[in-house]
Amino acid sequence: MELGGPGAPRLLPPLLLLLGTGLLRASSHVETRAHAEERLLKKLFSGYNKWSRPVANISDVVLVRFGLSIAQLIDVDEKNQMMTTNVWVKQEWHDYKLRWDPADYENVTSIRIPSELIWRPDIVLYNNADGDFAVTHLTKAHLFHDGRVQWTPPAIYKSSCSIDVTFFPFDQQNCTMKFGSWTYDKAKIDLVNMHSRVDQLDFWESGEWVIVDAVGTYNTRKYECCAEIYPDITYAFVIRRLPLFYTINLIIPCLLISCLTVLVFYLPSECGEKITLCISVLLSLTVFLLLITEIIPSTSLVIPLIGEYLLFTMIFVTLSIVITVFVLNVHHRSPRTHTMPTWVRRVFLDIVPRLLLMKRPSVVKDNCRRLIESMHKMASAPRFWPEPEGEPPATSGTQSLHPPSPSFCVPLDVPAEPGPSCKSPSDQLPPQQPLEAEKASPHPSPGPCRPPHGTQAPGLAKARSLSVQHMSSPGEAVEGGVRCRSRSIQYCVPRDDAAPEADGQAAGALASRNTHSAELPPPDQPSPCKCTCKKEPSSVSPSATVKTRSTKAPPPHLPLSPALTRAVEGVQYIADHLKAEDTDFSVKEDWKYVAMVIDRIFLWMFIIVCLLGTVGLFLPPWLAGMI
């Protein structure tokens, strides 16, 4: 049917009426739903008093179900002993005055209302340390048609917490949060634990602490102020510190600094930096101890384990300073200031080094000792240097006896290969070879000790003692016909120095020394003396190297002039001085070795202490299950 037909004007009014009626009904239904909550609020709060407990009878008890949900563990202040947490306080109770029938209000079963308009239990945090005891942000409450009220306001609490820093930084703390009504006793308001544990579904993990456990318990207590019994719900938080930060920044540096204390006793005493290192370690440990005192509570009844470790190490560092001063004193001792007791020599030079597996290096003083012994033998041997019984007869100026040097002149047989030779008392120098061959005369003569042919000398052989340079070369002539290269003590041995003592021959021998005779001696006379420079070995006495041509009578000794006597006294003085220096050096080395042994003893002691201290630092927390 078309609307433009003849019946169209008749159908249009009924359609418009039907459409208007539907729109009116829909608008009235929306208006009814919106006004239902308004009417409900007017009905609920008309004559409602939020100051009275929501009970029908005065003897009834309001049961409040209480729960806690933690959102974040903000901080644990060890210094002020506070725990800061962000929690949601769950509370639920029934208010009989806030009931309605949903059928009367367009099936409205629940509404959100401002919490300021209704009665709320005055539940506060008992062990609040700072801030507000009660909830400050009053959020809306969820009201159900049966009179049940749910209120979950957020809150940031700073609760007091007794911090136990015994195993710091491997510590585990037990902090509590105690909630309860401030004014209503158990006869008015009773608490019911909503959950046995704290809700951690929305917990944001902390970078320093981890919650091991959080359990809520219901308690009742009668306080001294009042006769009533007050209930409370206490949540015990078991939190454990994450020790990585403190291990990297506190424990490892402390251990390394403590190990430096061990190196103090390994540092040689000659360097002079032992005291400086000790004081530097002591100051470093003091700085770390100050860092710990800033972290731990100042009123703590216990000392943290790392504090005990640092304090123990500081005591040992202080002792190391005292010991180092003593060791340096021992190290620089000398025979002129201290005498080494026998027990010190026995204990620290014999017994303790063997126990510590120490082997003392040998002191290279053999050459010096041989040198001193040689000088003593040269200066004090009676067979070479007896006191002269009288002055020698006067001689001519050209043939006068020159005062010999501290060389030993004794008659020797003419060797197969005559010539001066030098032997060194030192093991480090090779034996010297003869520098020049000499021809031995086949006819003995009582003539004087002469140089080789072609060489004229003004007197006897002169050999320098304590020479430090080569005295001659193979082609060089020396005084008295003696050539030798010497680096140390030498003595000159005339080969044929005297004739057998016969009647009238002694005077002839002395007279023959005053002439420049170049004639060959008769066959029945001793040959002219030939001098050989020899070095005296340390282990062989000079008398052992002397070979006499005749064993029937001892050779006569040469008289000593005053100059030669002074030279002998000088050699004796030098030998005594060197011997005293050698003795002083040996005693000083003994004192230095005693200081080294004492250092080694305390080195091992401190190594053991550091190991035991490290084990003592980590073992108790490990046994307690905190590591």
UniProtKB/Swiss-Prot annotation:
Phenotypic consequence of E294K: Loss of CA(2+) permeability
Region (Disordered): 382-481, 496-561
Protein's UniProt keywords contain Lipoprotein: yes
Binding residue positions for Ca(2+): V76, E78
InterPro entries: Neur_chan_lig-bd, Neur_chan_lig-bd_sf, Neur_channel, Neuro-gated_channel_TM_sf, Neuro_actylchol_rec, Neurotrans-gated_channel_TM, Neurotransmitter_ion_chnl_CS, Nicotinic_acetylcholine_rcpt
Activity regulation: Activated by a myriad of ligands such as acetylcholine, cytisine, nicotine, choline and epibatidine. Channel potentiation by calcium is stoichiometry-selective, CHRNA4:CHRNB2 nACh receptor is achieved by calcium association with topographically distinct sites framed by anionic residues within the CHRNA4 subunit and between the CHRNA4 and CHRNB2 subunits. nAChR activity is inhibited by the antagonist alpha-conotoxins BuIA, PnIA, GID and MII, small disulfide-constrained peptides from cone snails.
Residues that bear Phosphoserine: S424, S538, S541
Disease connection: Epilepsy, nocturnal frontal lobe, 1: An autosomal dominant focal epilepsy characterized by nocturnal seizures with hyperkinetic automatisms and poorly organized stereotyped movements.
Protein name: Neuronal acetylcholine receptor subunit alpha-4
Source organism of the structure: Homo sapiens (Human)
